[in-house]
């Protein structure tokens, strides 16, 4: 198992750190052999957290895929220190993978009070922000973060396979850099979230007036004492809400869950 620890100066105002409780969050990113968590393995993980004005990143990389259990054990120690975590597209990959592997090896990883998938949080506002893409690199560039690394996830997987055969130190350093840089930018992406909220930026895919009227009518019909924040509901989410309200009786909590799980 290869272990690295990096200390980086955190260039975020204390006010924003406190407003968004950024120092109460563990930030992480995994590298895997397959997108299917039942078939693949986690071979690298980077975990970041804030201490004072520093952003600390701890990183574990398997020199052999048989070390995956050890990687999960060490990661769990850090993940379980925090009530909240943040990822980029973690709802689709990192979270299910981590839980799948923790169950496989009998290692407890606690569910989180708050989970922030920055991909899902920021993507609906990309066009309103003038962005053509919703990639991590695109959001990084928007806030002035220039990467050293230029690889994508598929490149990294190929390079890892090369490393397993060659043990080339340069290849190793490149894949470690990619994984750590994927985590380094995560707290900074909250600056975009902060900007969106304080400037009342609208979603690019905001629900239509017709959908808004339909939801309002169905909520009243169901006798729910609830007014959704329509400024945060997409067309896709609106379709789910309308379907759910038509299909069955929903409580306010059920409706909030539908909204929360959509983006």
Question: What does each model-identified segment do?
Answer:
Residues 1-23:
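N-terminal accessory regions of nucleic-acid-interacting proteins
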Residues 56-76:
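Nucleic-acid-processing active sites and adjacent nucleic-acid-binding tracks
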Residues 83-92:
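Acidic beta-strand-to-loop metal/phosphate-binding motif
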Residues 58-63, 226-233:
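A short, exposed loop/beta-hairpin motif centered on an aromatic-Gly-Thr core
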Residues 203-205, 239-263:
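Low-complexity, Ser/Pro/Thr/Glu/Lys-rich regulatory segments of predominantly eukaryotic nuclear proteins
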Residues 140, 207-225, 238-244:
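A short amphipathic alpha-helical interaction element
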């Amino acid at each position: 198992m290869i272990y690295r620890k990096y200390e980086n100066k955190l260039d975020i105002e204390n006010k924003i750190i406190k407003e968004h409780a950024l120092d109460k969050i563990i930030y992480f990113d995994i590298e895997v052999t397959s997108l299917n968590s039942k078939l693949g393995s986690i071979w690298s993980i980077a975990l970041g957290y804030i201490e004072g004005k520093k952003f600390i990143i701890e990183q574990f990389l398997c020199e052999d895929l048989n070390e995956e259990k050890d990687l999960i054990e060490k990661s769990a120690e850090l993940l379980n220190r925090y009530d909240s975590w943040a990822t980029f597209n973690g709802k689709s990959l990192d979270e299910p993978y981590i839980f799948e592997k923790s169950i496989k090896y009998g290692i407890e990883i606690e569910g989180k009070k708050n989970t922030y998938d920055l991909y899902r949080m920021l993507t609906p506002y990309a066009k309103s922000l003038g962005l053509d893409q919703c990639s991590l690199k695109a959001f990084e560039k928007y806030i002035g973060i220039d990467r050293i690394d230029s690889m994508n996830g598929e490149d990294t997987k190929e390079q890892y396979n090369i490393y397993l055969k060659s043990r080339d130190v340069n290849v190793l350093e490149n894949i470690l850099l990619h994984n750590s840089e994927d985590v380094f930018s995560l707290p900074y992406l909250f600056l975009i979230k902060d900007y969106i909220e304080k400037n009342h930026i609208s979603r690019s895919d905001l629900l239509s007036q017709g959908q808004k009227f339909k939801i309002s009518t169905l909520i009243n019909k169901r006798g729910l004492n609830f007014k959704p924040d329509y400024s945060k509901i997409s067309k896709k989410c609106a379709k789910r809400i309308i379907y759910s309200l038509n299909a069955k009786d929903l409580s306010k909590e059920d409706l909030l869950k539908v909204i929360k799980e959509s983006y």
